[in-house]
C-alpha cells in the first residue's frame, strides 16, 4: 500500500503526515565509524549537480532510483515511496529543481563502514523500536 502522504492525501493528524517512508538511521553510540552517505547536489549546476540531466533522467531518479548513467542511486534514496507519484507531481519536482539557484559543490564520495570520513557529517540520531 502506498503511503497516503505520497499519494497526495496526507493525514495531518499523524506523525510524518501518515507516511511510512522515513529517513534511514544509524547508531553512532554503537558504531564508532559507521558508513557515511553524502546527499547528492540536486541543484541545476551543470558541472556538479543535475544541470545536464534531462527531465526524463530526473523523473527516473525520483521514481526508480536510477541515476543519469543507468546505475542504481544510493540505497538510502527512498525511491520506492515515490514510484507511484503522478506524472504531474514528478514533472513539478523536476521543474522545481530546475528553478532553484545552481550551486557548484562537488559532493564527497561515500565512506564504507569502518573507515574514517574525511569530510564532516551529521548524525541524525539514535532510533529504537518501541516495545
Where do the language-model regions lie?
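Flexible coil segments in periplasmic/lumen-exposed cytochrome c-class electron-transfer proteins
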Residues: 1-38, 56, 68-131
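Second-shell loop/turn segments in exported
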Residues: 44-50, 79-81
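Residue-level signal for the nucleotide or nucleotide-sugar donor/cofactor binding architecture
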Residues: 53
